[in-house]
A protein has these predicted regions:
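An N-terminal, well-structured beta->alpha segment
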Residues: 1-7, 13
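Glycine-rich, small/polar surface segments that engage phosphate groups of diverse ligands
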Residues: 10-84, 89
């Protein structure tokens, strides 16, 4: 339970300070990353303003270009290099 509370605190602090959440995963976890990002952006259980969340698993062109040019192990790092800022959180 302590790990979950810590995670929730990190997410809350990131969003309150204007940071963005980035989600990534491989295989089935890639689908989970997309689902979680969508819940933050759209809504979860009740209407509220959208929250800044991005799944790094959605752009096939970027994923395959990075994999081809830099190696599969760089597909998320390269996107974070281009898109993230200090204060963002990778999940």
């Amino acid at each position: 339970m302590e790990a979950l509370e810590t995670h929730a605190r990190w997410v809350s602090e990131t969003l309150v300070s204007g940071g963005r959440l980035f989600f990534c995963g491989n295989g089935g976890s890639a689908a989970d990353a997309q689902h979680l990002a969508a819940e933050y952006v759209v809504r979860f259980e009740r209407n509220r303003r959208g929250l800044a969340a991005i799944a790094l698993t959605t752009d096939a062109a970027v994923l395959t270009a990075v994999g081809n040019d830099f190696g599969y192990e760089q597909i998320f790092a390269r996107q974070l290099e281009a898109l993230s800022s200090k204060g963002d959180l990778l999940i």
